[in-house]
Amino acid sequence: MVGFPEYVGVVKDYLLVIEDKADLAKHIKLDDKGNISAETAAITDYAVNGAVFYGKHLAENTSYKKVIVFGVSGDEKKHKITPVYIDETEFHRELLEVESFISFNEDNIDEYYIREILKENTD
């Protein structure tokens, strides 16, 4: 049906998936209920939709319990990075946009997970 994500990597026990589109207009497509569309055309043409599709597939077919996917669109100067968390049940939740991937390196990813995904205070 569709190809492969641009990037798949592992940081600690997190599986990270990046789907990239050059055009900001191809960042995300929502359905009429405001959810991330799972239509084939949306998966192939939009960054976030493709990332969620790949992430769900990997959550289902690997042993990873924590999958964070990123829909990335635009270029270096003007871009959007939308992370979406997917757990082993394939539940997914769109997270706040980020400016870069610094929160997802080995030193920061656990704190990001606790603060942004579990919604617990890390102070």
Language model: regions and residue ranges:
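Charged, often low-complexity linker/regulatory segments
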Residues: 1-3, 14-16, 28-29, 105-123
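A short, conserved, highly charged catalytic patch centered on acidic carboxylates
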Residues: 1-68, 72-84
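Domain-level recognition of nuclease-like catalytic cores that cleave nucleotide substrates
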Residues: 56-120
